[in-house]
Amino acid sequence: MAALAVNKPGAGVDSGRQGSRGTAVVKVLECGVCEDVFSLQGDKVPRLLLCGHTVCHDCLTRLPLHGRAIRCPFDRQVTDLGDSGVWGLKKNFALLELLERLQNGHIGQYGAAEEALGISGESIIRCDEDEAHVASVYCTVCATHLCSECSQVTHSTKTLAKHRRVPLADKPHEKTMCCQHQVHAIEFVCLEEACQTSPLMCCVCKEYGKHQGHKHSVLEPEANQIRASILDMAHCIRTFTEEISDYSRKLVGIVQHIEGGEQIVEDGIGMAHTEHVPGTAENARSCVRAYFSDLHETLCRQEEMALSVVDAHVREKLIWLRQQQEDMTILLSQVSTACLHCKTLQQDDCRVVLAKQEITRLLETLQKQQQQFTEVADHIQLDASIPVTFTKDNRVYHGPKMEIRVVTLGLDGAGKTTILFKLKQDEFMQPIPTIGFNVETVEYKNLKFTIWDVGGKHKLRPLWKHYYLNTQAVVFVVDSSHRDRISEAHSELAKLLTEKELRDALLLIFANKQDVAGALSVEEITELLSLHKLCCGRSWYIQGCDARSGMGLYEGLDWLSRQLVAAGVLDVA
């Protein structure tokens, strides 16, 4: 652009004045950071900062960010950026209007128009009559470039005035000559597939050459059609570029929100200072630390409670064992005294006869004490181990077996009693309607299930609620072979799940009689009972089974055990 401001030799005083004016215009239109000329669009669009200075878009994107703000490179004033970043800053429309007017040649006939052409990136064409002037028209007859003044002077006669003169933008393209027949211009395009590598042809090629008889079209319409498709493609590319740029800006904003950074803020007296703005990553880490800190505190409290339970159990056991020690010591002393007395009596026959009743009483006392010792010894397990089991909520249970209360419910004839006795005695029991309830204890691994089997007839169902108290798990049995009773089972299960006393109870559904031909599958029963909707927010599981063979029953107990007992302690004896 500086070259455009240099006065040409012979340009005169006016040319020098116009050149200096063009230089001043260019200086106004330059970015003060990169010294490149502003443009109407693209990376060199002028944008306004809060302080009033104008910087091109490209330089603004290169400025260091302070949180969500940038500093003016000239006066260091702060400008806050919104969610759109630099793209959200206002354009300098006064400069844009000036640029547009310069490119349209509205400012000055020579100097400013010349500068505008330079700004727009086009080559400057000099007037063929006077090189100090810039050409603005083209004479198609004379084939010369002329400025408006020289065009009037050279074509002032009647003959020359008839020459067609067009603006430079409408200047016809020079015809390309055929490489085979150099005296003929290319006028046609071959449309044959085999000729697409060399489709251009002149009239000789068309009539007599290698393109003879080929389908063809006229060069200019074909070029215009391709040119239109190129313009469409360029428009699509611009749209696509804008989409990519917008997406990139969003990515930059998201990265800034994730990483956080420094933000420039003003205090009460107007002094600017930086402060740290935490990103979403730091907030997430803080949430994790807070969660695990609370978890550690909760675990510490649960550990203290569990240790207090174990300590109390150990203390009670030691007190009882020491009491037994004292009792055994007293018993041993009494036995020793009786033996010594008997030994003393047997030394004299007369004394033995006289002490007969006393000896009889001693023997009876010893027999009673021996009987008591035998009974106590049978019930005492001399085992120093202290077995413990942990529940899912980190509570500790001491003892060889953890007791679980289970209620088995379902429609009549579903197989509840058959399942109970198969688990208890491992034998099949013929179906008999349950009048009232059955209760059995089933030991499985280190768990002891106390299972209450309640009758499922219509008149007994209102009594189910009396068995809900302290129930830890509900086993609901469904007859898979009776499709017509599924809706009735769904209704009873829905009522069951509304009970407050069963709010925290586990739900195990046995799809019984899977061995019967035509029985509903587990998936079909799940859908017909709407289990995903009905049991939302509750721990539940459905297990296909056959009460006759026992298939699937222990898989159900396994699921119950895993839900009730912490992982890794199921097999601890």
UniProtKB/Swiss-Prot annotation:
Q: Positions of the region ARF-like? A: 390-573
Catalytic reactions on record: S-ubiquitinyl-[E2 ubiquitin-conjugating enzyme]-L-cysteine + [acceptor protein]-L-lysine = [E2 ubiquitin-conjugating enzyme]-L-cysteine + N(6)-ubiquitinyl-[acceptor protein]-L-lysine
Task: Return the broad EC class.
Answer: transferase
Say yes or no: keyword Transport present. Answer: no
Q: Which PANTHER family match?
A: ADP RIBOSYLATION FACTOR-RELATED
Q: Pfam families attached here?
A: Arf, zf-B_box, zf-RING_UBOX
> What subcellular compartments does it reside in?
Cytoplasm; Endomembrane system; Golgi apparatus membrane; Lysosome membrane
Highest taxon listed in the record's lineage:
Eukaryota
The UniProt entry, under InterPro entries, shows: Bbox_C, P-loop_NTPase, Small_GTP-bd, Small_GTPase_ARF, Small_GTPase_ARF/SAR, Znf-RING_euk, Znf_B-box, Znf_C2H2_type
Zinc finger motifs (B box-type), residue ranges: 122-168
Q: Which gene encodes it?
A: Trim23
Q: Which named protein is this? A: E3 ubiquitin-protein ligase TRIM23
The residues that cross the membrane are none
Q: Which UniProt keywords apply?
A: Coiled coil, Cytoplasm, Golgi apparatus, GTP-binding, Lysosome, Membrane, Metal-binding, Nucleotide-binding, Transferase, Ubl conjugation pathway, Zinc, Zinc-finger
**Sites where the protein binds GTP:** 411-418, 454-458, 513-516
Involved pathway(s): Protein modification; protein ubiquitination
* Principal location listed in the UniProt entry: cytoplasm
* Subunit structure, as described in the record: Homodimer. Interacts with PSCD1. Interacts with UBE2D2. Interacts with TBK1 (via N-terminal kinase domain) and p62/SQSTM1.
Question: Which processes are annotated in GO (biological process)?
Answer: intracellular protein transport; positive regulation of autophagy; protein ubiquitination; vesicle-mediated transport
Q: Name one GO cellular component term.
A: nucleus
Q: Which family does it belong to?
A: In the C-terminal section; belongs to the small GTPase superfamily. Arf family.
Which sequence ranges form a coiled-coil region, renumbered to this chain?
351-378
Q: Where are the zinc fingers (RING-type)?
A: 31-76
Q: Supply the EC number(s).
A: 2.3.2.27
Tell me the domain comment. The RING-type zinc finger domain is responsible for E3 ubiquitin ligase activity.
Gene Ontology MF annotations: GDP binding; GTP binding; GTPase activity; identical protein binding; ubiquitin protein ligase activity; ubiquitin-protein transferase activity; zinc ion binding
